[in-house]
Curated annotation (Swiss-Prot):
SUPFAM superfamilies: Indolic compounds 2,3-dioxygenase-like. Heme binds at residue 238. Substrate binds at residues 49-53, 111, 115, 252. Pathway: Amino-acid degradation; L-tryptophan degradation via kynurenine pathway; L-kynurenine from L-tryptophan: step 1/2. This is Tryptophan 2,3-dioxygenase. Keywords: Dioxygenase, Heme, Iron, Metal-binding, Oxidoreductase, Tryptophan catabolism. Heme-dependent dioxygenase that catalyzes the oxidative cleavage of the L-tryptophan (L-Trp) pyrrole ring and converts L-tryptophan to N-formyl-L-kynurenine. Catalyzes the oxidative cleavage of the indole moiety. Belongs to the tryptophan 2,3-dioxygenase family. One of its GO terms (biological process) is L-tryptophan catabolic process to kynurenine. The lineage of its organism: Bacteria, Bacillati, Bacillota, Bacilli, Bacillales. It holds the Pfam family Trp_dioxygenase. The keyword Heme applies.
Length: 280
């Protein structure tokens, strides 16, 4: 009797014939996505390793999609639509941060069973992660040779290197609103990592001291702080997870591993948005 109660008939309006119509699996191209987890070993836990990294790359793709649109909104002096995009990016970052706790279920012994299969493949080579860092203002031309084997990605990386970051766009928004910004900042070489500037800090201080007058700039600043803070948390969780799994071994891509990742924690984003808090 219990089994019958748990059964139910499909509602009459539910479609069941997809011979000539698009289905859920067809729309999402699940045949391609779900056939892309190709293990190079017979070890059970390699599937976890692959899926964590593949899903992270999908989330990064969405971050870049939202970030590109947000930067354009700011450059167009249309700040408000960007706030929704930044809020979404922040939620995506939370997903990415949480994914490290899933990967940390992989023990050192389990990882060593298939690590050699990776060769020199490494998260260091994640071009989407590099594009996110570029978009947040941390440019580094020295990483480009890592991607020269793929002309399309190399061109995309080069273009991003020379494009304004979201912080460059935000600083231009300050100038558009009449806040004095040094000319060498407004016309700087975008391929270089942004360096702190007194005029930018003073402009942000003016915004924070006059919130009602500059509400949208204030909101923009706080959205950037959210994203910068989440990115630092992601970096920390990355470092912590790597240390938990491989200790201080060198990375498969040739980096110093945990030591390299720890150095990245010293490179924060949007410097004046942090220093102003002491002076406010």
């Amino acid at each position: 009797m219990q089994n019958k109660q748990n059964q139910f008939e499909l509602e009459k309006g539910i479609h069941t014939d997809f011979q000539e119509e698009m289905s859920y699996a067809g729309y999402l191209q699940l045949d391609k996505i779900l056939s892309s987890q190709q293990r190079l070993s017979n070890h059970h836990d390699e599937m976890l390793f692959i899926i964590i990294h593949q899903t992270s790359e999908l989330w990064m793709k969405l971050i870049l999609h939202e970030m590109e649109a947000a930067i354009q909104c700011i450059l167009d002096d249309d700040l408000e639509p960007s706030f929704k995009m930044f809020a979404r990016i922040s939620r995506i970052q939370q997903q990415l941060i949480q994914s490290w706790s899933v990967l940390s279920t992989l023990t050192p012994s389990e990882y060593m069973e298939f690590r050699e299969c990776l060769g020199h493949a490494s998260g260091f080579q994640s071009y989407q992660n590099r594009l996110i860092e570029f978009a947040l203002g941390q440019k580094n031309a020295h990483v480009l040779p890592v991607f020269q084997h793929d002309p399309e990605i190399y061109e995309k990386m080069t273009r991003a290197l020379h494009s304004p970051s979201v912080y460059d766009a935000a600083i231009k928004a300050l100038a558009v609103r009449g806040l004095p910004i040094d000319e060498d900042v407004l016309h700087r070489d975008y391929s270089q990592t942004y360096q702190p500037n007194a005029s930018v800090e003073e402009a942000w201080l003016t915004v924070y001291r006059n919130v009602d007058r500059y509400w949208d700039l204030y909101e923009l600043a706080e959205k950037l702080v959210d994203i910068g803070s989440q990115q630092q948390t992601w970096r920390y969780m990355h470092m912590n997870t790597v240390e938990r799994i491989i200790g201080y071994k060198k990375g498969t891509g040739g980096s110093s591993g945990v030591s390299y990742l720890k150095k990245s924690l010293d490179r924060s984003f949007f410097p004046e948005l942090w220093t102003l808090r002491t002076k406010l």
